[in-house]
Regions:
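Phosphate/pyrophosphate-binding catalytic cores of soluble transferases and nucleic-acid-acting enzymes
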Residues: 2-163
């Protein structure tokens, strides 16, 4: 146990994740590209909208030339039709970080989605995947009977949480 604790401490001392956060159009992207060029590293986006291929307007994505110059992760990563969550983002990002830290010792994470950033910086509670048929059933109940029906079910099944 002590050896693994020592190894973890050495890993953390050797490897650094630099986080650049802030509101849209505050200069985060330009700063991250400047730093990545200077440090010879890659960029991980923690933006909940830049991840989607179809969302380009209003998301302040890096330019095509910036994307060619510096390796960016999670820009145009998937379609808006794909199911995605902060939990999935957290798992994928942690895998990428492990891989990157085997090659380089500093990585830049940039974006304004606080929940995405917090999932990496502080961790996230893991929840089991909800079965598709359960989701469909609850959505149907909501559409047909409204939120009051869902609230009464919650009160019945988990009165402590409901209150």
């Amino acid at each position: 146990m002590l050896n693994s604790a020592i190894a973890a401490e050495k890993f953390l001392m050797k490897n650094k994740l630099v986080y650049i956060g802030g509101p849209t159009c505050s200069g985060k992207t330009n700063l991250s590209i400047l730093l990545a060029n200077t440090l010879g590293t890659e960029i991980i986006s923690c933006d909940s909208r830049q991840v989607y291929k179809e969302l380009s307007i209003g998301t302040a994505k890096p330019s095509k030339s910036d994307l060619k110059t510096i390796k960016h992760h999670f820009i145009d990563h998937l379609s808006i039709h794909d199911e995605y969550s902060v939990g999935t983002y957290s798992m994928e990002t942690n895998e990428i970080l492990k891989s990157l830290f085997n090659k380089i010792n500093i990585v830049i994470m940039v974006g304004g989605s606080g929940l995405y950033a917090d999932s990496i910086l502080y961790g996230i509670d893991r929840f089991p995947k909800v079965k598709t048929d359960i989701k469909k059933q609850l959505i149907s109940l909501f559409k047909n009977e409204g939120i009051k029906r869902l609230n009464s079910m919650l009160e019945e099944y988990d009165p402590e949480y409901y209150n």
